[in-house]
């Protein structure tokens, strides 16, 4: 499908219209990558997510300009949002080593123990406004926790989702850990929320 800029109505890109089959392929990839990502030492996951943050910072101006053209929002807002996206990855990278910290809260009558484990492949569905930053708001904590992700960005502003996926790959994050499927909510989005491999869904907006 074509995505158009709200600034002047110009066609920005031709975008793959993902469907249930594409979601299934992405979910399968996320499932296959889950065990090794889950079992990767937290310090290594932290290092990779910090590399993603660095890559976002290095490309912040390009991200901001693309966001402006794709969403129609002002550069002064999108420039700050791009930096915030890097900060999101840094914040959650620092949480990698705490991701499985449980609690031991004994009382006189009970001994209460909580544990944390990565739930598995998760879906992330993000909105059209400030799409890059809001995507990192859900993707970064999921990756830090040891989950793998299938991301379905809003069809109204899909351009920077591809850039995020490329930066994540360039940073050295293994294949299958982050998977992006474009498409419409009633097709790709619905298939994602109903897929049996996907253990949880994160919505933003």
List where the protein language model places each region.
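Histidine- and aromatic-rich ligand-binding microenvironments
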Residues: 2-5, 11-25, 172-177, 181
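A generic short alpha-helical patch detector that favors 3-5-residue windows
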Residues: 1, 22-25, 55, 114, ...
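Conserved beta-strand positions that form and line the central face of beta-propeller blades
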Residues: 2, 14, 66, 77, ...
């Amino acid at each position: 499908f074509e995505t158009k800029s709200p600034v002047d109505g110009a066609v920005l890109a031709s975008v793959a219209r993902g469907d249930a089959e594409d979601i299934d392929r992405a979910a399968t990839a996320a499932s296959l990558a889950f065990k090794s990502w889950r079992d990767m030492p937290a310090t290594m996951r932290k290092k990779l997510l910090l590399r993603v943050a660095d890559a976002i910072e290095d490309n912040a101006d390009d991200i901001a300009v693309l966001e402006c053209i794709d969403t129609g929002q002002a550069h002064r807002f999108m420039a700050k949002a791009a930096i915030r996206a890097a900060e999101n990855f840094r914040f959650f990278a620092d949480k990698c080593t705490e991701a499985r910290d449980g609690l031991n809260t004994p009382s006189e009558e009970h001994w209460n123990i909580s544990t944390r484990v990565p739930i598995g492949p998760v879906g992330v569905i993000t909105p059209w406004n400030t799409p890059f930053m809001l995507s990192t708001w859900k993707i970064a904590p999921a990756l830090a926790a040891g989950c793998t992700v299938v991301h379905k960005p809003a069809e109204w502003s899909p351009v920077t989702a591809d850039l995020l996926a490329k930066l994540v790959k360039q940073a050295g994050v293994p294949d299958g850990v982050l998977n992006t499927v474009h498409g419409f909510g009633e097709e790709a989005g619905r298939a994602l929320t109903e897929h049996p491999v996907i253990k949880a869904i994160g919505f933003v907006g």
